[in-house]
Amino acid sequence: MHPITPVHYLALSAALLLIGTVGVLTRRNIVIILMSIELILNAVNINLIAFSHALQNINGQIFAIFVITDAVAEAAVGLGILIALFRNKETVQADEIDLLKW
């Protein structure tokens, strides 16, 4: 059995970042876009934890906790806006929402 090295964590983080970026760029459903943004933030957290562990410095882990709390607040605000838009427009497709257009 081989030990898990920081390279494994970075590969996992790169895969999550790629999946999240593709989801944000290709999907039009706002729920899927929010989930993809959360995947990107989780990739950032894995990077922070991996480098924190490799460098024997706790600052990365503390910063990851702040990123998690920021992601929770972002998800709450995003879902609140999504519910308000759904009640107003009856759709969650990003292409059909033109509330900010004149």
Swiss-Prot record:
EC number: 7.1.1.-
Any one of the GO CC terms: plasma membrane
GO molecular function terms attached to this record: NADH:ubiquinone reductase (non-electrogenic) activity; quinone binding
Segments crossing the lipid bilayer: 4-24, 30-50, 62-82
Subcellular location: Cell inner membrane
Pfam families: Oxidored_q2
Keyword NAD recorded: yes
Record bears the keyword Kinase: no
Gene Ontology process terms (BP): ATP synthesis coupled electron transport
Domain of life: Bacteria
Major localization class: membrane
Protein topology in the membrane: Multi-pass membrane protein
Catalysis performed (reactions): a quinone + NADH + 5 H(+)(in) = a quinol + NAD(+) + 4 H(+)(out)
Keyword terms of this UniProt record: Cell inner membrane, Cell membrane, Membrane, NAD, Quinone, Translocase, Transmembrane, Transmembrane helix, Transport, Ubiquinone
Function of the molecule: NDH-1 shuttles electrons from NADH, via FMN and iron-sulfur (Fe-S) centers, to quinones in the respiratory chain. The immediate electron acceptor for the enzyme in this species is believed to be ubiquinone. Couples the redox reaction to proton translocation (for every two electrons transferred, four hydrogen ions are translocated across the cytoplasmic membrane), and thus conserves the redox energy in a proton gradient.
Assembly with partners or alone: NDH-1 is composed of 14 different subunits. Subunits NuoA, H, J, K, L, M, N constitute the membrane sector of the complex.
Family statement: Belongs to the complex I subunit 4L family.
Protein name: NADH-quinone oxidoreductase subunit K 2
Chain's gene name: nuoK2
